[in-house]
Amino acid sequence: MATTPVQPPVSNSPPVTSPPPPLNNATSPATPPPVTSPLPPSAPPPNRAPPPPPPVTTSPPPVANGAPPPPLPKPPESSSPPPQPVIPSPPPSTSPPPQPVIPSPPPSASPPPALVPPLPSSPPPPASVPPPRPSPSPPILVRSPPPSVRPIQSPPPPPSDRPTQSPPPPSPPSPPSERPTQSPPSPPSERPTQSPPPPSPPSPPSDRPSQSPPPPPEDTKPQPPRRSPNSPPPTFSSPPRSPPEILVPGSNNPSQNNPTLRPPLDAPNSTNNSGIGTGAVVGISVAVALVVFTLFGIFVWCLRKREKRLSAVSGGDVTPSPMSSTARSDSAFFRMQSSAPVGASKRSGSYQSQSGGLGNSKALFSYEELVKATNGFSQENLLGEGGFGCVYKGILPDGRVVAVKQLKIGGGQGDREFKAEVETLSRIHHRHLVSIVGHCISGDRRLLIYDYVSNNDLYFHLHGEKSVLDWATRVKIAAGAARGLAYLHEDCHPRIIHRDIKSSNILLEDNFDARVSDFGLARLALDCNTHITTRVIGTFGYMAPEYASSGKLTEKSDVFSFGVVLLELITGRKPVDTSQPLGDESLVEWARPLISHAIETEEFDSLADPKLGGNYVESEMFRMIEAAGACVRHLATKRPRMGQIVRAFESLAAEDLTNGMRLGESEVFNSAQQSAEIRLFRRMAFGSQNYSTDFFSHSSYNSRDANV
């Protein structure tokens, strides 16, 4: 009697608690015993098992020949659709492929514990024997250590009906894996089955051995199997968290049903890792390029800064002219000639010139060079001698004329301190100041180098045998010296107190512009002789009275000394004249009562220099006497600042701004409407004729109103 085998439906739902119904009393020819997996049946494991990295496939259980069981009842889960029964077909043509790994629904949706779904049917009895009592076959689970966080469950493939009497087909080999993958054995049956089981699908390669499908994951939802008698079921991929390879059956022929391996899920990860590596390499390359460009920019910036520093010393081109000298002068007769900056070098204990920068310039000179330039510091080259040392005229190898000052400060001060102080002073530049352009340190010797000034100093022109200075020149010299001192006191950083203002330290240009020299030398002497408390800084006749009582020099001390210089310009007398009668040797003490009388009566003949012959401007003489009287006051707090003295001299020149016209006697000429040149300028400057016309008209009306 022929039987029509019916393939049981595949269930991807959790285990069914109710036993399957009894099988039909159909008989089938005897078949060899089923081929089972090597593992013996094992008891059901606990509900939860750690998920393996790949989905695990199990060998299907044997089914009865010719006695297909009826379809199982509908699973209780609502999330999984019920399996559809397979229409029976002739045994030779029916070869259902093994079912791929299918995730099962979460345990929350199934009332029984989350286990691998049991086999759809229990093993049927032999032919012509009533089916045994229905009993649910226990599910077979094989545990496997999970590599991922969430568990993955893969149900076993459905049983297939093979009523043929041929021996069972061989099972296709499994892909290679690090450890053998064990398939769960078929469930035990009371009676042996007589139909060969279908080939068990191979398990995918995995890093760890997969022994059984674990309990269902929490977030995985089951998908309904698509069963077809002649086509293999679709392959479902495991959850994204696991990295297994998924088997895809090739055809419905068991002998040619070689599984197709999909690439593992961690392939994208390797691609991402490769992409990340490439990005990191690109980022590192860009960073290295930026660092190289930054270093190159810093190098170029340093070179440009060095060039600017060297070129900052250069100035106007002034050709020195021959000069006459006197031993009475305490300063060199030099001037700034900045056509060539200076560089430096050191050799054999002394600083040697170093060609560099522009025009082989140098700021540090060797002692041998200065000896050669001054002809061995001969008396023929001596320009003057004062409290700080002797001044010699010298000619450098490049033809420049310089003044070399030998300081009498000894070697008490360290080289670093002296060099730092000189560098600070050499940075001071003003049109009414003489700056230091070089220095030399050789053992205990200290030398300063200035450019040569050709027109001597104020002391020489006032008290020498040359022609008499006219009044206008004297006013010009006084105003220039006041500006230079005001710069040192108020605008220079750090502020500098000269400490030795006198007529011999006011050098004159060829056009009689005044330039104050030797500023800062008193401080150098004090720094080098701090242990000497009896040294007197300054010159008798110029020193302020508070210095004699306290020994303290302040800015007001310089103001007092400048007042003495003003008295020299007014009277033509020396600060201390021993040829005068007793009690009149001091210029300040002699001039005090005369200053008060001249301010009250505006009679200046008693104070004015007889050499002038009365050729002076009375208003300027009055202003000059007034300024001198304020500077030589006894109390330092009553003396004006140098800035106030400068403004007093500027007011002398401000009187010429009116050009002989008085306020209110003139009318502003409106040239905006009558001069063609002004109209052209207006169009070029403003672009709009109406706007510029209103502007000029408004200014003209305001000027007229102000005059009225």
Curated annotation (Swiss-Prot):
Domain Protein kinase: 377-652
Signal peptide: none
Membrane topology: Single-pass membrane protein
GO molecular function: ATP binding; protein kinase binding; protein serine kinase activity; protein serine/threonine kinase activity
Glycosylated residues (UniProt): N25, N269, N272
Binding annotation for ATP: L383, G384, E385, G386, G387, F388, G389, C390, V391, K405
Main location: membrane
Single GO biological process annotation from the record: cellular response to hypoxia
Residues in compartment: Cytoplasmic: 302-708
Record-annotated membrane-spanning stretches: 281-301
Assigned EC number: 2.7.11.1
Listed Polar residues bias regions: 250-260
The family this protein is said to belong to: Belongs to the protein kinase superfamily. Ser/Thr protein kinase family.
Quaternary organization: Interacts with KIPK1 and KIPK2 (via its cytosolic domain).
Protein name: Proline-rich receptor-like protein kinase PERK9
Species assigned in the record: Arabidopsis thaliana (Mouse-ear cress)
